[in-house]
Amino acid sequence: MKKAFRVLFSFLLLLASLGVFISNKVMFLKKKDDEEIFNRETEAGHLVPDEYDALPKREVTIPSSFGYALKAVLVEPHDTNRYIIIAHGVTQSKTNSVKYMNLFLNRGFNAVIYDHRRHGESGGKTTSYGYYEKFDLQSVVNWLRKEKGPDLLLGIHGESMGAATLLLYAGMLEDGADFYVADCPFSDFSEQLAYRIKEEVKLLPPKLLLPVANLFVRIRDKYSLSEVSPIAVIENIKNPILFIHSRMDDFILPSMTEALFEQKQGPKKLFMAENGLHAQSYSQNRDQYEKVLDEFLEEYVFAGDGIVAAD
């Protein structure tokens, strides 16, 4: 009897230890150093410091509904009501968003780039892969509309976690932008976490570890993994979405974006890039990326509003 109790106790202790370990990985995933991001982006030609410094812009602080500050940059080289909000991926910062910002500046948009909670200069203690981040995105949208007025042509571009965040925002809170660009999102966080566990934690099966991880995330960060599921809410998004993914992505599988595209009703477009790994669709397929973006904007955004594209 005592031996059976010891075995049970040891097993429960192991599960608890794994629960703490995995929930720590989820909530406190190691972020990339700001200098590392800056150097990578400048070396790739995505960010030219002199050109960025010359842009008319101002740093702004946007209050999150959870009590911390979201640090953002409002970039306004154009006299226009067109604005794009850029949401970066997990472990990154708004510096990573500059390359996407430039795409839209070149197409006549002004832009807001911002740091997610617990990233860059923003506050917040944990990363939730879109659960809390969707409310922060709503705060950014509300701030921009209050600052510039309600009559905006507004788009949101997101990469990886940022893409999942914009889909959760649009599908769960409000379809508050005129269009969206979702670059390499996951379709369901539980499935994504199970896949990463299978790839990285080979000792125990995901079916055993996922419920433990979910329990500890619920206890420690007050949400369930099942509540971070863009595919469960994609049907609520009526405005146009451009879905983008690299066929070679082995971190978030391209089949997730394909499933989101199939589930989305109404105006949509899909670009499966031939080159690059995760979040490299633009850097490894620049000409095609820009061509597809232009086609999407012409077909679903500018044409619908009688707007002529900027030269």
Predicted ranges, named:
Residues 168-223:
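Hydrolase active-site cap/lid region
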Residues 127-148:
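Alpha/beta-hydrolase active-site loop
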Residues 236-238, 243-245, 249:
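Short beta-strand/loop motif that positions the catalytic acidic residue
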Residues 284-311:
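Catalytic active-site module of serine/aspartate enzymes centered on a nucleophile-bearing elbow/loop
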Residues 148-160:
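Alpha/beta-hydrolase fold nucleophile elbow
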Residues 100, 230, 239, 253-262:
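Short alpha-helix in the alpha/beta-hydrolase fold that links the catalytic acid
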Residues 101-123:
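Conserved alpha/beta-hydrolase
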